[in-house]
A protein has these predicted regions:
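Helical "substrate-binding/catalytic lid" subdomain
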Residues: 1-115
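ATP-dependent carboxylate/acyl-activation modules
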Residues: 119-132
Length: 132
């Protein structure tokens, strides 16, 4: 279910962008997600990396695209359209084109920030996951 985390990471960035663009404070958005059905490992693990602006370099866009490619190959046997997998693949391809294959996975969110002219920095003690 690795592809689920890719979809969730992109969706987290989109949700933050929609909220910020409509005047909702980022901390309020994040707390609302954590206290709703939107809560997930991705929300708790990835959001602080977005807030800190390092985008968690422990996993690259290139690795995301490799895994999404494998999922795409495996999905041919499903016999049904999988639009979320295609959408996630497209979002990560766009980010990789802009920032390079070695850029951190969460550059899929940075792309949204840059395109929309928004900042998802949030003051706080955001200890990187690899230092916890």
């Amino acid at each position: 279910m690795l592809f689920r985390s890719f979809i969730a990471a992109a969706a987290l960035g989109e949700g933050f962008a929609v909220g910020i663009a409509n005047g909702v404070e980022l901390r309020t958005l994040w707390e609302s997600i954590l206290n709703s059905v939107g809560d997930s490992f991705v929300a708790r693990h990835d959001a602080p990396s977005i807030f800190a602006g390092h985008y968690d370099p422990s996993f690259s866009l290139g690795l995301c695209l490799k895994d999404l490619g494998l999922i795409g190959e495996l999905s041919t046997g499903v016999g049904a359209d999988l639009p979320l997998t295609r959408a996630a693949t497209h979002a990560f391809e766009i980010a990789a084109e802009r920032y390079g294959m070695e850029a951190a996975e969460l550059h899929v969110v940075k792309h949204i920030e840059d395109e929309a002219g928004l900042s998802m920095r949030l003051a706080g003690d955001w200890t990187p996951p690899w230092e916890q």
